[in-house]
A protein has these predicted regions:
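Short S/T/G/P-rich N-terminal loop/turn motif that feeds into the first structured element of a domain
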Residues: 1-76, 81-93
Length: 93
């Protein structure tokens, strides 16, 4: 018998100028993610374009996470890390 998934997930997909620079910025922003109830981040890269990044994360508090994804803190961190264009951000259960 399958147990229903009760964990919400947050997926962020975007292109970056340079993966190494972006990854350092992503890692440095861990405290901010955790304070928003976002944990267990897994980073995936497109095999054909290593600067095309998808991040899958667990969400403990959807309201806090939604506030965080709309925050100037995240926008600034993404800009500093070299995110290109607007990210695609989705919540899923």
């Amino acid at each position: 018998m399958n147990t229903p998934n009760t964990t919400e997930n947050l997926t962020i997909h975007h292109k970056v100028q340079d993966y190494t620079k972006w990854r350092a910025g992503y890692d440095a922003h861990e405290t901010s993610r955790r304070s928003a109830g976002i944990t267990n981040g897994r980073v995936f890269r497109n095999a054909e374009d290593p600067n095309d990044v998808i991040v899958l994360q667990d969400v403990g508090d959807v309201a806090k996470a939604r506030t965080w994804v709309a925050s100037e803190d995240l926008k600034s961190a993404m800009q500093k890390a070299g995110v290109v264009g607007s990210p695609t951000i989705r919540f899923a259960a």
